[in-house]
């Protein structure tokens, strides 16, 4: 570990300078030789580093989600070129280039803070050995050696012997109890962070090798922390524990406010967002607009939780816009079906359905109602002027016809030897 720390000696001076500046502030409050002054200086160093790494953390989230999305395509490439490793690598790089994904982006925060971690280890190791290093001069060195956190010196390790611990002004029991508790807390925080990531923030609709890797890391990382933690000074354990707690809180914030699409966390988030939007009638924050904008842009590729969210807004008389805003939409209601297609129905007044009548009601006509003429009756034939007496006799003859046809169901029947339908008038020459 000392050899690795020496490789990052170029950053030892900046790290020691930052610690000294924070120690000056906290020393004026708690006293320069107290463990609180030195411990809080290390914690403040962690917070400062992690704030500077927030842009890299955002890039890590995007890269991780991009890798999750590409897992099905990567699996197809591996199966297609399983006997040609070179072609497989070429296709993988081509896929990364087309989608703009960099697999190393997910490791950027860890790689970026590694130099600070080893530089701090180098500084604390110098304090334990009594050597001035970086910005820490002899008076600050003596002050740091006197500082204890819950009875354990900053430079003490779990593996140190009784003589070395006594030279730092502490007992071996106190050092081992404090370091063991910190190692357990460090491993537990790492396990909880990975478990939250696996159970809530992973797309459950796609089973990929990436999920198996994350599940394996959930158990491997805590064991690694426990193994390496016994060789780290108390000050480094404070740094590492603070880093894990920060990561856990940061991950919980991301899971709650910007979850992975298709995960359980996204379903919970969209339920809360739907409740907020229906109460206020709009999206209130920039993050909410970004989520709605991404869902609208997906179109038919929305997952079940996203379709449920869009349909819920439409049923509430709201419509999600392409810019992420939500507006009232009383004219149309769009509902997305299971296959992703959107069906829009316009709100129109209900058409009045005619009252159904039975066969006997249709046949029984009122006495004063005239039966409508059809194309099968003789009334379609051209009529010449006839005497008045003959015209008066026709209604009487026509009045008897309904009684004669009552057994036939009111259906117009053609006479025997006569073709159905309208008849051609007889030629005058045949009369």
UniProtKB/Swiss-Prot annotation:
InterPro entries reported in the protein's UniProt record: YidC/ALB3/OXA1/COX18 (IPR001708), YidC/Oxa/ALB_C (IPR028055), YidC_ALB_C (IPR047196)
Places the protein is found: Cell membrane
Q: Which UniProt keywords apply?
A: Cell membrane, Chaperone, Membrane, Protein transport, Transmembrane, Transmembrane helix, Transport
Could you tell me the superkingdom of the organism this chain comes from? Answer: Bacteria
Q: Name one GO biological process term.
A: protein transport
Q: Where is this region: Disordered?
A: 337-431
Which CDD domains does the record cross-reference, listed alphabetically?
A: 5TM_YidC_Alb3
* Basic residues: compositionally biased ranges: 421-431
Where does it mainly reside?
Answer: membrane
What start-end ranges are recorded for coiled-coil regions in this protein?
A: none
Under the heading NCBIfam families, the entry gives: PRK01315.1 (NF002350), yidC_oxa1_cterm (TIGR03592)
Q: Say what the protein does.
A: Required for the insertion and/or proper folding and/or complex formation of integral membrane proteins into the membrane. Involved in integration of membrane proteins that insert both dependently and independently of the Sec translocase complex, as well as at least some lipoproteins. Aids folding of multispanning membrane proteins.
User: Record's family?
Assistant: Belongs to the OXA1/ALB3/YidC family. Type 1 subfamily.
The protein depicted here goes by the name Membrane protein insertase YidC
Biological source species: Streptomyces coelicolor (strain ATCC BAA-471 / A3(2) / M145)
Upper lineage is: Bacteria, Bacillati, Actinomycetota, Actinomycetes, Kitasatosporales
């Amino acid at each position: 570990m000392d050899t690795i720390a020496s490789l990052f000696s170029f950053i030892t001076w900046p790290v020691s300078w930052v610690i000294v500046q924070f120690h000056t502030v906290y020393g004026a409050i708690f006293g320069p030789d107290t463990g609180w002054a030195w411990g809080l200086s290390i914690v403040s160093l962690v917070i400062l580093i992690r704030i500077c790494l927030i842009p890299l953390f955002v890039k890590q989230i995007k890269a991780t989600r991009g890798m999750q999305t590409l897992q099905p395509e990567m699996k197809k490439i591996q199966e297609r070129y399983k006997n040609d490793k070179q072609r497989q690598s070429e296709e993988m790089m081509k896929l990364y280039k087309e989608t703009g994904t960099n697999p190393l982006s997910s490791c950027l925060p860890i790689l970026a803070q590694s130099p600070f971690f080893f530089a701090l280890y180098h500084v604390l190791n110098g304090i334990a050995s009594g050597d001035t290093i970086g910005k820490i001069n002899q008076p600050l060195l003596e002050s740091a050696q006197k500082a204890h956190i819950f009875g354990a010196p900053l430079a003490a390790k779990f593996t140190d012997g009784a003589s070395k611990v006594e030279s730092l002004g502490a007992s071996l029991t106190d050092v081992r109890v404090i370091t063991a508790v910190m190692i357990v807390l460090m491993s537990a925080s790492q396990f909880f962070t990975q478990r939250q990531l696996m159970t809530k923030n992973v797309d459950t609709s796609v089973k990929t090798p990436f999920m198996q890797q994350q599940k394996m890391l959930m158990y491997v990382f805590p064991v690694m922390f426990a193994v390496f933690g016994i060789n780290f000074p108390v000050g480094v354990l404070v740094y590492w524990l603070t880093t894990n707690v920060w990561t856990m809180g940061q991950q919980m914030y991301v899971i709650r406010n910007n979850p992975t699409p298709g995960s359980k966390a996204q379903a919970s988030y969209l339920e809360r967002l739907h409740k907020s939007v229906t109460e206020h009638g709009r999206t209130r924050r920039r993050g909410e607009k970004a989520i709605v904008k991404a869902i609208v842009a997906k179109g038919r590729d929305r997952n079940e939780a996203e379709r449920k969210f869009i349909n819920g807004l439409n049923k509430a008389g709201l419509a999600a816009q392409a810019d992420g805003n939500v507006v009232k939409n009383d004219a149309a209601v769009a509902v997305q079906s299971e296959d992703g297609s959107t069906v829009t129905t316009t709100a129109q007044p209900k058409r009045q359905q005619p009252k159904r009548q039975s066969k006997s009601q249709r046949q029984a006509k009122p006495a004063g109602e005239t039966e409508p003429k059809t194309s099968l009756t003789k009334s379609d034939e051209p009529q010449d002027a006839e005497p008045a007496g003959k015209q008066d006799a026709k209604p009487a003859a026509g009045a008897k016809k309904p009684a004669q046809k009552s057994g036939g169901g009111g259906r117009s029947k053609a006479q025997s030897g006569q073709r159905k339908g309208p008849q051609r008038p007889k030629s005058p020459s045949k009369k």
